[in-house]
Amino acid sequence: MLLDVQHISKSFTTGYIRKVKKDVLKDISFTLWKGETLGIAGTSGAGKTTLIRILMQLLVPDGGVVLYRGVDLGGLSGKEMLAVRRTMQMIFQNPAAALHPRMTIRESIEEPSRLYGKMDHFEERMQEMLSRLQLRRELLSRYPAELSGGELQRVALARLLLISPEVLILDEPTSMLDVSVQAEILTLLQELQEDREIAYLFISHDLDVLSAMARRVGILSAGRLVEIGAAEDVLHHPQHPYTQELVRSFFAL
């Protein structure tokens, strides 16, 4: 087991005059195993972003723990957490968000490897990765604004795969891409997972994507994980009323 999320809760207080406590996550528990894809679905405001921030230790939960390889991430020092982040990384919905607009594509691809001391045989490994991801070498001298959405997402993948992560948190990674490019990226993710046994935590509102990618699926509603199980069961034979309505509404579109 790579990731073991146990009873995570988080609330925020809102309002200036009348303080109101809002529970954003309530008793969230799940596991993620080597080489598997766990999909998490939910509408806007379900708590997906807060969950991601807690998993990446950018936000402290009110209760519960996140264990990575059996170690409580909340108890790690900054240096220890840096080592964890080399093996647990994130792909953003908007790939440009991870790339500095004034850095060339080569500089952006090199950045994580330099940060985590993974520059051994870098040029050779980068060329292999460019070929694998179908990225033209001529793009290396360009800047993010000059690339298409599909090219940017491939760059985002390349820079992280060069540091050999064990877990990738994928936050709506194809939602900003057209259908043909989306299919290419999803196929690429599946191939990379088969080769490297990377574990994916795949966050998406698109149930078709989760059906294609995930072995297990969890449904997040108003901060609660109301249903989790095999993708076939959750998406085609849902038990919880919220999941039933979500599935019915999505596939009726």
What are these regions (language model features)?
Residues 64-72:
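Conserved ABC transporter NBD signature motif
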Residues 17-19, 73-89, 115, 234-238:
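ABC ATPase NBD coupling module
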Residues 41-43:
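The feature captures the beta-strand-to-loop junction immediately N-terminal to the Walker
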Residues 56:
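Helix-to-loop junction immediately C-terminal to a conserved catalytic motif
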Residues 143-147, 151:
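Conserved ABC ATPase signature
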Residues 121-138, 247-248:
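Conserved ABC ATPase "signature" region
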